[in-house]
């Protein structure tokens, strides 16, 4: 479990407030690796407006598999890398327990990997 603790000012957990997912149909590169996903959000969470023609009762289903926050990594073809947390809440969990937590460790490891060859 990553980020299952209080965050600074945005409620609980590293996934919330605004979320995003990996989706090949929407431009996620084929080489992207989904490291983890947060699911089970309340019905207050909906698809991005560009994915909906209209909002109706059917569009408010809570069990929609596309309403999730994906933690994604991919290497770019030019030698770089992308680490996407899939949620604006991620940053608010970095300082929890004096930075001794899963969010800080994973962020540190991702940044260290990106800087390794530079």
Model regions: which residues?
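Extracellular ligand-binding/catalytic regions of CAZymes and related secreted enzymes
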Residues: 1-118
């Amino acid at each position: 479990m990553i980020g299952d603790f209080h965050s600074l000012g945005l409620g609980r957990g590293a996934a919330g407030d605004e979320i995003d997912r990996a989706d090949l149909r929407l431009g996620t590169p084929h080489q992207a690796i989904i490291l983890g996903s947060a699911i089970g959000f309340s019905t207050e969470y909906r698809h991005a407006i560009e994915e909906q023609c209209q909002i109706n009762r059917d569009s408010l289903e809570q069990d929609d598999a596309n309403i999730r926050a994906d933690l994604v990594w991919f290497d770019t073809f030019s030698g770089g890398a992308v680490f996407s947390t899939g949620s604006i809440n991620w940053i608010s969990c970095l300082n929890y327990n004096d930075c001794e937590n899963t969010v800080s460790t994973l962020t540190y490891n991702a940044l260290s990997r990106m800087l390794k060859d530079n």
